[in-house]
Design a protein with these regions (language model features):
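Boundary at the C-terminal end of the N-terminal hydrophobic targeting segment
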Residues: 20-22
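Short glycine/acidic-enriched loop and turn motifs that connect beta-strands
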Residues: 68-72, 158-161
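Predominantly five- to eight-bladed beta-propeller fold
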Residues: 24-26, 78, 156-202, 214
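Bacterial N-terminal signal peptides that target proteins for export
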Residues: 1-8
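Bacterial N-terminal signal peptides
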Residues: 8-17
């Protein structure tokens, strides 16, 4: 692993100590008894939904993301799990009520992931958690360079090229002034664009980074199907 990344992880542990967790219900795997062979809404919501999965560099482990949902709480919870490549020794890594996602291998012993809009790392047993970023804008995706000296961070920045901002004297107005096409993506209006930021990995963590599409009206990755790839 890159030396700066190792130093940053150690420094983060010394500075943060124990991270306080929000007092929220920790939604996990549901135990449901099927009384018939009918597929019911309750049965569907009780099922975990597997997201991304990645094999370790040596091919011995697989880490993957699972989404669990609670009808009572009216929300979901994304968790990370790890298992041997043969499917044995499956283990839950996420212990917080906050979601953890977008997991990736840094080496055979270290994982990087997102939680609460920030980039973190941890060991493959779930210990040694370190926060690498302190971004004012939530991080939505990331990809480390092969030498681990730089990382691409995906952040959404405000964009009003097609939907104009509300006038200062009408800040709570719900009407919209649309002046161009591409003002909506499927289920949401385009008031922000995803931009890739190239950041350096230093001994103090990961810096803010440089927006390589600064001032441009484009988005990368592109909604709704674009990803960090």
């Amino acid at each position: 692993m890159n030396r700066n990344l190792t130093v940053a992880m150690t420094a983060a542990l010394m500075m943060t100590g124990t991270v306080s967790q929000a007092q929220e219900v920790n939604i996990g795997r549901s135990n449901i008894t099927l009384k018939s062979d009918l597929m019911t809404p309750e049965a569907l919501w009780a099922m975990g939904r597997i997201g991304s999965a990645q094999a370790s560099p040596d091919g011995k482990k697989i880490v993957y993301q699972v989404g669990y949902y609670s009808v009572k709480e009216n929300r979901g919870h994304q968790v990370l799990r790890i298992m041997d490549a043969d499917g044995k020794n499956d283990k839950l890594l996420t212990t917080s009520a906050k979601s953890e996602s977008d997991v990736a291998w840094l080496d055979n012993q270290t994982l990087a992931f997102l939680t609460d809009g920030q980039l973190w790392t941890m060991s493959t047993d779930g210990s040694n958690r370190h926060q690498l970023t302190h971004s004012d804008i939530a991080i939505e995706g990331f990809r480390f360079s092969p030498d681990k000296k730089r990382v691409v961070l995906v952040k959404s920045i405000p964009y009003h090229g097609t939907i104009k901002e509300n006038p200062d004297d009408l800040p709570k107005a719900t009407g919209m002034l649309i002046t161009d096409m591409n003002y909506r993506h499927w289920d949401h209006y385009v008031t922000s664009n995803a931009h890739p930021f190239v950041a350096n990995v230093t001994a103090n963590g990961v810096d803010v980074g440089k927006d390589i599409l600064e001032g441009e009206p484009y988005e990368s990755p592109m909604a709704p199907f674009g990803g960090i790839e």
